[in-house]
Amino acid sequence: MPSRSKSSQRWLKEHFADPYVKKAQAEGMRSRAAYKLEELLQRDRLLKPGMVVVDLGAAPGGWSQQVRKSMGDSGRVVALDILDMPALAGVEFLHGDFREQAVLSQFEAMLGDVPVDLVLSDMAPNKSGMDAVDQPRMMHLAELAMEFADTHLKPGGAFLIKLFQGVGSDDYIRELRRRYEKVTIRKPAASRKRSPEVYALGQGKRVQIK
């Protein structure tokens, strides 16, 4: 157990020394992940006034908060999560599992006939510390997010998702290329260097999968 204790202490020390953690606390953002998204949104100019943005696995709300901040009062931000999330001004939150038809029906009722312009997913499993367990779980969540975008994202729309580099990630990116005109892999500055995470961005959703 001592090694785990040292590891936990090291993580806590790094966490509280992290400039993005300090920035999030100072600016009232719910998570440091908001700054990963901020860089990606600006770099690829993903947001336009009046867009409809869906944030999958949104809790604690850092990404939804960043999108609302970036778009001002225009457009709609719809956040979904199986975990509860305290209310955010200008964000519509749906609490539930989007794999369930009842939750999807609620989502569709919320949107009405309004098309979705951008689907975001920063979902990740609770880590066990074993790649053989964590990577398949991560890829399963990624598959679910891609299926959601297949169904709900409008033609020409964009899909941004967090992936862990490892078994299955290359195949997943190939699947994205069948669905989107342009696929780019990003590693934002706020992403910890030792983390296996990258962000895959699909732009220009095809009408039909190639």
Curated annotation (Swiss-Prot):
EC number: 2.1.1.166
UniProt protein name: Ribosomal RNA large subunit methyltransferase E
Entry's family note: Belongs to the class I-like SAM-binding methyltransferase superfamily. RNA methyltransferase RlmE family.
Keywords noted in UniProt: Cytoplasm, Methyltransferase, rRNA processing, S-adenosyl-L-methionine, Transferase
Active-site positions on this chain: K162 (proton acceptor)
GO molecular function: rRNA (uridine-2'-O-)-methyltransferase activity
Enzyme class: transferase
Domain of life from the UniProt record: Bacteria
Record organism: Xanthomonas euvesicatoria pv. vesicatoria (strain 85-10)
Family annotation (NCBIfam families): PRK11188.1
Annotated function: Specifically methylates the uridine in position 2552 of 23S rRNA at the 2'-O position of the ribose in the fully assembled 50S ribosomal subunit.
InterPro entries: RNA_methyltr_RlmE, RNA_MeTrfase_FtsJ_dom, rRNA-MeTfrase_E, SAM-dependent_MTases_sf
Main location: cytoplasm
Keyword S-adenosyl-L-methionine: yes
GO cellular component annotations of the record: cytoplasm
Pfam families in the record: FtsJ
Catalytic activity, as annotated: uridine(2552) in 23S rRNA + S-adenosyl-L-methionine = 2'-O-methyluridine(2552) in 23S rRNA + S-adenosyl-L-homocysteine + H(+)
Localization terms from the record: Cytoplasm
Binding positions (S-adenosyl-L-methionine): G61, W63, D81, D97, D122
